């Protein structure tokens, strides 16, 4: 028998991370760090997130680091707006500015190119593609439930 499912998932995830890192760094979008790009993507998908919601998705990163990153995206790069909720002034929400939305589109375009290359290289038949989509949907549901990440535009 070949490798275990767990081992294959690890091998694939490692290679995807390496491939994405090399391709994304070649096409650096908006001079963003990986963390900044991910925050832009999260806020873009959710529409609006509190700083604590964003921080909860980074359990190994301190709240002050997340807050500093968001402040940099707000003050220095003008990619997000920070808003204090009138009904609870202890909560600050983050939304994308128009410039942030443009950068998000660039990020998506760059990633679409990378993922398209991967998808085409698999050479799946229509039946294999349908089955593969079901596997991917199940993985997405797992991560959404594990990380409480209910994204607005995820249609499975």
What are these regions (language model features)?
Residues 6, 98-117:
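Conserved segment of winged-helix/HTH DNA-binding domains
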Residues 1-31:
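N-terminal leader segment of winged-helix/HTH proteins
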Residues 41-42, 105, 133:
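A cross-family signal for key residues in well-ordered alpha-helices
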Residues 30-36, 97, 122-127:
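Short helix-coil-helix linker/hinge
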Residues 21-65:
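N-terminal helix-turn-helix DNA-binding core of bacterial DNA-binding proteins
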Residues 109-156:
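Terminal interaction helix/tail motif
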Residues 13, 17, 104, 140-144:
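A structural signal for well-ordered alpha-helices, especially hydrophobic packing surfaces
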Residues 47-92, 98:
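Canonical helix-turn-helix DNA-binding module
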């Amino acid at each position: 028998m070949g490798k275990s499912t767990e081992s294959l998932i690890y091998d694939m995830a490692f290679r995807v991370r390496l491939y994405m890192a090399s391709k994304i760094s070649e096409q650096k979008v908006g001079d963003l760090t990986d963390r900044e790009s991910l925050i832009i993507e999260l806020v873009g998908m959710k529409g609006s997130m509190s700083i604590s919601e964003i921080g909860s998705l980074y359990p190994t990163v301190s709240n002050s680091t997340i807050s500093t990153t968001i402040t940099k995206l707000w003050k220095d790069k003008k990619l997000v707006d920070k808003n204090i909720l009138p009904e609870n002034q202890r909560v600050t929400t983050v939304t994308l500015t128009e410039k942030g939305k443009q950068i998000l589109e660039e990020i998506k375009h760059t990633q679409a190119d990378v993922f398209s290359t991967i998808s085409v290289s698999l050479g799946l038949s229509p039946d294999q593609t349908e089955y593969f989509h079901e596997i991917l949907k199940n993985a997405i549901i797992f991560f959404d439930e594990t990380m409480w990440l209910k994204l607005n535009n995820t249609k499975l």
